[in-house]
Structures are given as structure tokens and as C-alpha cells.
Swiss-Prot record:
Presence of keyword Ubl conjugation: yes
Record's keyword annotation contains DNA-binding: yes
Low complexity bias locations: 211-234
Entries under PROSITE patterns matching the protein: GATA_ZN_FINGER_1, GATA_ZN_FINGER_2
Protein name: Transcription factor elt-2
Chain ranges of zinc fingers (GATA-type): 237-261
Intracellular or extracellular location(s): Nucleus
Species of the source: Caenorhabditis elegans
Length: 433
């Protein structure tokens, strides 16, 4: 079965092949065009006949109708509205299909009323004029006057001007934000001949702390006059209404109380009952008199201990000086003995070392005729054996020796403990004698 298609085909017909098939004829489609609802807008459809090449009593016919619709152009009037100017001069090198509208900003924006777009074409160069010189324009300034914000100083509550500084919680003016430089008064030094410089502090500054001893003395001297001073001030105990006390205190509320009421509340944590108030003279402790006539046993014992410490320190100093003197004396004696022993002239040792004239025969050589000790010589002595190759003459040997006149004796300091103990014992013996 063959199908033939073409553009804008509204009808088609199928024909049987040339050979009959069972003697049946297929129904054909109605070739008449469909009814149109709007007869005024559609033209009469043209008809075209297509002959088939098959030689068959049943012909195949196709009707092709053009699908063109004829509409009458309508022109409508556009309602007038406002348009702003558009600069088309920059669009000359752009593609019309990809061109985007460009809206430049102007300081003075013209306002114009446009009617219908008569004579408007598709070309970008044939734009209608959007500016009319006869219509007034509205000038909009490019800049607006701005008002500087005002701030209030968080410290002095005044308006902050130029030079203000941002701080935590607000702004601070230049006067409050500028650090104040404080200068301490100079310290005066008085220098006098023969005396060390004394530091003088001006009266504006607080004076230095007083020594502990002077503070104790002043407190002990003023303790007796506390009662009279407190009575002169007119203080009254808020608990017992008493005025005679040696020391004024304050309770938890800050009210003045006497010494008895203050101590009672401190120990028992309850106010002192008024029934415990005693009239008459106050009981005070027995203290040392200022004259010093009456001395307690403790004071005498302290004086004795002080004297003993002084005497013992004196004795220790004396013993140490004696020890140093004895040590120096022992060093001098040791040095003198060492020098004397080193520089003393040798004496005859004939009785100590008897020399025999008998020959001593050895396997390798024979020694005989040893020189005797020279008792008259003032130089050092030496025994020289009788050498078979060279004989030392007695005269040459004696004249060739010189006395030892450059002997230097170095006395080393005592280092070991035993020697030190012996030196101390020697000093003790010298001191006793």
C-alpha cells in the first residue's frame, strides 16, 4: 500500500492495486473540503487532481488545498502614556536580535507624551523622535544636601563636634577623650657639707610610714588618754548608754559601742545585757611604769641574758683574735725553721758514716778509695768514686762547688684537720704560758 504526502494536505485517498483482491472495493474518503465556521475569513479552497500511473479502473485521487488564511489588518489606537528618553546611538554595532535595551541616567530627564507609533519601522535607525522642545523638562539634581549626624558625649553630655572618638557605649568629645597629663610635685634635696642628703617630701603628699617601735610607743602613751578624749568627743554607747570606756568600737550597723559591749558581742554574737554594766572606775591591766624603778623578775632575767650574750660574744672575739695571732706566730716559726734548715752549713758526718778504705770488688768494675767528707769546706759535700777513666782531683772538685745562696723556701698553708688541731693546741699552750 502506497501513501503519498504533501504539505498542507487536507484530503487524501487510497486506491487499490491493479490486481483485484477478492472483488471488494474499499471505501474512499470524501474529497469535499470541511465546512468552515467562519466563511468570511477563509477563501475558497482550490482543488488539484493527481493522476496515478496505475492502469486500474479504481483511480487514486488526492486533493491538496492551500492553508493560507487571509486576515484583514486592524489598526488600534494606543493609549497615551509617559516614556523616558532612550539613547539609540550606542546600538549601531550591535545585533538587533541580541540587543538589550539601554537606559542611561541623566541629571535632567525630559518628559514627553507620545501618541500612536505612526511610521514606526523595524529598522533600528528609523526611530521616532522622543524629544519635543516645546514640552518643559524636569531637572532632578544629581546630589542632595546631607545633614551630618550629631552625637552626645557619654561623659559630659555635650554635643560632640570635630575630633570625637567612638568609645564603648557611644561617642566621646575631643575634650573628654584627650588624656590628661598629671605632674607630681618635685622632690627637694638639701645637701649640706659633711652630712648625707636628706629626702624632703612636700606636705601635699602623704608622709612615709612611721617605724614600728615609734608607733608602739605612741599608741602606749596615748592609751591612757583615750577615755578622756572619748568623753570630750561626746560619744555614747548605743547599747548600754555609757560614756566611760578605754576604747570605742562599732557594731555591725556602724553605731559606736563601748569596749565591753563590743567584745561581748564579738564573743557571744548577742548584745551585752544592760544588767552587766558596772559603774565606777574601769578595770585596767597592770602595766610597767614609765620611770623603770619597779622591775619585774622577767625584766631582770632578760637583762642578765642580754649581758651574758654580750660577754660571750666578747670572749668569742678574744679567742678568735688569739687564735689568729697564734696561727700567725706558728706560721712565722715554721717559716724560720724551714729557712734555717735549708740554709744551714753541713757539718762533719764522719762519726755517722764511717768509710772503709778496703776495695769493693764487683764482677764488672772495682770501686775504691772513696773521697772522705770534707769537713773544712763551706760548700755542699759529695762523694765521687774513683773512676778508672777519669780521676777527679780533690782541689778541682772543691773549687768547682759554690754555696747554695739562692734557696727559696715556700711554706704551704695548713690544710688538713689534724694539723689545724695541733696548731690550736699549740696556741692554747702559748696562751696558758
Amino acid at each position: 500500500m502506497d501513501n503519498n504526502y504533501n504539505d498542507n494536505v487536507n484530503g487524501w485517498a487510497e486506491m487499490e492495486p491493479s490486481q483485484p483482491m477478492g472483488g471488494l472495493r474499499l471505501p474512499t474518503q470524501n474529497m469535499d473540503p470541511p465546512e468552515q465556521n467562519n466563511e468570511s475569513q477563509l477563501s475558497e479552497l482550490p482543488r488539484m487532481k493527481i493522476d496515478n500511473d496505475y492502469a486500474s479502473p479504481i483511480e487514486r485521487q488526492s486533493v491538496i488545498t492551500s492553508g493560507t488564511n487571509n486576515y484583514e489588518p486592524k489598526v488600534e489606537t494606543v493609549t497615551s502614556f509617559f516614556h523616558t528618553g532612550i539613547d539609540y546611538s550606542n546600538f549601531g554595532m550591535l545585533d538587533q536580535t541580541t540587543m538589550q535595551p539601554f537606559y542611561p541616567l541623566y541629571s535632567g530627564i525630559p518628559v514627553n507624551t507620545l501618541g500612536t507609533f505612526s511610521g514606526y519601522t523595524n529598522s533600528i535607525y528609523d526611530k521616532p523622535s522622543l524629544y519635543d522642545p516645546s514640552i518643559p523638562t524636569i531637572n532632578i539634581p544629581s546630589t542632595y544636601p546631607t545633614v551630618a549626624p550629631t552625637y552626645e558625649c557619654v561623659k559630659c553630655s555635650q554635643s560632640c563636634g570635630a575630633g570625637m572618638k567612638a568609645v564603648n557605649g557611644g561617642m566621646m568629645c575631643v575634650n573628654c577623650s584627650t588624656p590628661k597629663t598629671t605632674y607630681s610635685p618635685p622632690v627637694a634635696y638639701s645637701t649640706s657639707l659633711g652630712q648625707p642628703p636628706i629626702l624632703e617630701i612636700p606636705s601635699e603628699q602623704p608622709t612615709a610610714k612611721i617605724a614600728k617601735q615609734s608607733s608602739k610607743k605612741s599608741s602606749s602613751s596615748n592609751r591612757g588618754s583615750n577615755g578622756s578624749a572619748s568623753r570630750r568627743q561626746g560619744l555614747v554607747c548605743s547599747n548600754c548608754n555609757g560614756t566611760n570606756t578605754t576604747l570605742w568600737r562599732r557594731n555591725a550597723e556602724g553605731d559606736p559601742v563601748c569596749n565591753a559591749c563590743g567584745l561581748y558581742f564579738k564573743l557571744h554574737h548577742i548584745p551585752r545585757p544592760t544588767s552587766m554594766k558596772k559603774e565606777g572606775a574601769l578595770q585596767t591591766r597592770k602595766r610597767k611604769s614609765k620611770s623603770g624603778d619597779s622591775s619585774t623578775p622577767s625584766t631582770s632575767r632578760a637583762r642578765e641574758r642580754k649581758f651574758e650574750r654580750a660577754s660571750s660574744s666578747t670572749e668569742k672575739a678574744q679567742r678568735s683574735s688569739n687564735r689568729r695571732a697564734g696561727s700567725a706566730k706558728a706560721d712565722r716559726e715554721l717559716s724560720t725553721a724551714a729557712v734555717a734548715a735549708a740554709t744551714a752549713t753541713y757539718v762533719s758526718h764522719a762519726d755517722l758514716y764511717p768509710v772503709s778504705s778496703a776495695a769493693v770488688t764487683l764482677p764488672d768494675q772495682t770501686y775504691s778509695n772513696y773521697y772522705q767528707w770534707n769537713t773544712a769546706a763551706t760548700a755542699g759535700l759529695m762523694m765521687v768514686p774513683n773512676d778508672q777513666n777519669y780521676v777527679y782531683a780533690a782541689t778541682n772538685y772543691q773549687t768547682g762547688l759554690r754555696p747554695a745562696d739562692n734557696i727559696q723556701v715556700h711554706v704551704m698553708p695548713v690544710q688538713d684537720d689534724e694539723t689545724k688541731a695541733a696548731a690550736r693546741d699549740l696556741e692554747a699552750v702559748d696562751g696558758d704560758s
